Amino acid sequence: MPRPILYDYWRSSASYRVRIALNLKGVDYESRQVDLRKDEQRSGEYRALNPQGFVPMLAIDGHRLTQSLAIINYLDLRFPIPPLLPASAAERAHVVAMAMSTACDIHPLDNLRVLLYLKKEMGQTEEAVDRWYAHWIEEGLSALEAMAAPTAGKFLFGDAPTGADVCLIPQLYNARSRTSLSLDAFPTLLRAEDNANAMEAFAAAHPDRQDSGQEKVQ
């Protein structure tokens, strides 16, 4: 199989998710950075590959895959060991719901392009945007804590990482990067984070381990 190519941005939560999934599956891949600070995702060259102009995009098996959850689902089907979803239909639905609560409920409201729009187009102050971010983070993580607590072990579902953890870890990273909100009210999430970050598959995907991760965004 030709080496897959991940069109990536070191600090993107969605890209971070896919890096984790690729590492968990043991897939060797090439990372090509698309610098969001320079609007490279809007270039004609990149939009010819991905009309949405988002990262990540994964070129694999002759396909160009977009949207992080779709990519992760493809990887789980293409490389079934280790599985990122349980076998039981009900348990599978629960894990998918937890993953979606992060990727579809929290992340879109606190995405960088939304925060910049609030500031530049809506005229909101830095303080107001910070309040917006903290509000949706706290509300979303509170819900996820309640969803995860009944089935959690070392991770959000049992004692092995699933797609829910793949989505959680980047969101907690961004929460710490962009707000001073205490996360102590989420012990289940923090336990999963500690166990995940002890695994090389998660640690190697961390933004600071990427080539461009040494340049800190101001």
Residue spans for each PLM region:
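Non-catalytic alpha-helical scaffold/packing segments enriched in small hydrophobic residues
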Residues: A70, Y74, H94-A97, S101, ...
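Short, solvent-exposed turn/loop segments enriched in Gly/Ser/Thr/Pro and often Arg
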Residues: D35, G163, R209
